[in-house]
């Protein structure tokens, strides 16, 4: 009884999404200190736990708010709440617990600015996006993307406060521009389900042709924005080469979507690639930051 419940509670946390959030946050932490130094290990651990718990809390609240929608979509109807494996009250208590503990850790062991920014991001995703924007406007992903793009900034401020935060904003901008083509590709793949539950995703309100064009334009913009860390002398040639290669590959997927309007399989492949794109881009940022430095010293 207890073990299945724990498994279901963890399923509410969207652990794969949290892992990607944590990756971008930790890259922000390490880039916040100059090579060859490393950020304090205990600080990194505390910030990682706090940010992860807050992200998991936001995911739980997303499940609670979207319970009725999830029950009607084949992609989500096996989730714990629609299946009745977890009650609404249990989910709410779990979400509150994760949020309070996560924010408490950030306040006690990291710093106030990171706690405040994390709280704002949690509210932005769990309430402003999930409760209002998602159901109110086809630009829900664009506006709500600010909350999802915050983790690199949270990681940066956890280590360096506001010092050099303009560089963290470049990382924020990359994730912010990445978000629309990432989610719109999924929306094209699942457009009939979004129509069924009356969620005004862009393909539902403006049609597939318009959405394909927007994905293409945003992907071009993402390729350009991804070069900013190099242009700002934040990264070197390794990052530049990889960013261009990853961006061109993403653009090829966007062109395929544009040229194959009836093949939703391509949209799904684009969605999957976009996740790999972001992971590889941020790992490359970290590798480029340290690759010439041996041995490393603890900051």
UniProtKB/Swiss-Prot annotation:
It comes from the Bacteria. GO terms for cellular component: plasma membrane. It catalyses: heme b + (2E,6E)-farnesyl diphosphate + H2O = Fe(II)-heme o + diphosphate. It is an enzyme of class 2 (transferase). The keyword rRNA-binding does not apply. Keywords: Cell inner membrane, Cell membrane, Heme biosynthesis, Membrane, Transferase, Transmembrane, Transmembrane helix. Its main location: membrane. The keyword Disulfide bond does not apply. Pfam families: UbiA (PF01040). The chain crosses the membrane at residues 17-37, 41-61, 91-111, 113-133, 141-161, 168-188, 207-227, 228-248, 266-286. Pathway: Porphyrin-containing compound metabolism; heme O biosynthesis; heme O from protoheme: step 1/1. It is a multi-pass membrane protein. It is found in: Cell inner membrane. Its EC number is 2.5.1.141. One of its GO terms (biological process) is heme O biosynthetic process. Carbon 2 of the heme B porphyrin ring is defined according to the Fischer nomenclature. NCBIfam families: cyoE_ctaB, PRK04375.1-2. Converts heme B (protoheme IX) to heme O by substitution of the vinyl group on carbon 2 of heme B porphyrin ring with a hydroxyethyl farnesyl side group. This is Protoheme IX farnesyltransferase. The lineage of its organism: Bacteria, Pseudomonadati, Pseudomonadota, Gammaproteobacteria, Candidatus Pseudothioglobaceae. The gene is cyoE.
């Amino acid at each position: 009884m207890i073990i299945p419940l724990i498994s279901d509670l963890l399923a509410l946390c969207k652990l794969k999404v949290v892992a990607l959030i944590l990756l971008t946050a930790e890259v922000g932490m390490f880039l916040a200190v100059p090579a060859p130094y490393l950020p304090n290990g205990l600080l990194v651990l505390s910030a990682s736990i706090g940010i992860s718990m807050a992200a998991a809390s936001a995911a739980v609240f997303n499940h609670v708010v979207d319970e009725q929608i999830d029950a009607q979509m084949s992609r989500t109807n096996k989730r714990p709440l629609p299946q009745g494996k977890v009650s609404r009250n249990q989910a709410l208590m779990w979400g509150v617990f994760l949020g309070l503990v996560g924010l408490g850790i950030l306040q006690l062991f990291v710093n106030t600015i990171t706690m405040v920014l994390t709280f704002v991001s949690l509210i932005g995703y769990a309430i402003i996006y999930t409760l209002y924007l998602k159901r109110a406007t086809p630009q829900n992903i664009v506006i709500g993307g600010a909350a999802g793009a915050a983790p690199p900034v949270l990681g940066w401020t956890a280590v360096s406060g506001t010092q050099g935060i303009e560089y963290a904003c470049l990382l924020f901008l990359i994730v912010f521009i990445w978000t629309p083509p990432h989610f719109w590709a999924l929306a094209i793949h699942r457009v009939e389900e979004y129509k069924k539950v009356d969620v005004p995703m862009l393909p539902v309100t403006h049609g597939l042709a318009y959405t394909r064009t927007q994905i293409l334009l945003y992907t071009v913009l993402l390729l350009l924005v991804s070069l900013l860390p190099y242009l700002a002398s934040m990264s070197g040639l390794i990052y530049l080469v990889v960013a261009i290669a990853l961006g061109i590959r993403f653009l090829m997927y966007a062109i395929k979507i544009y040229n194959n309007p009836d093949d939703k399989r391509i949209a799904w492949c684009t969605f999957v690639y976009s996740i790999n794109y972001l992971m590889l881009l941020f790992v490359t940022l970290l590798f480029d930051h340290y690759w010439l430095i041996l041995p490393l010293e603890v900051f």
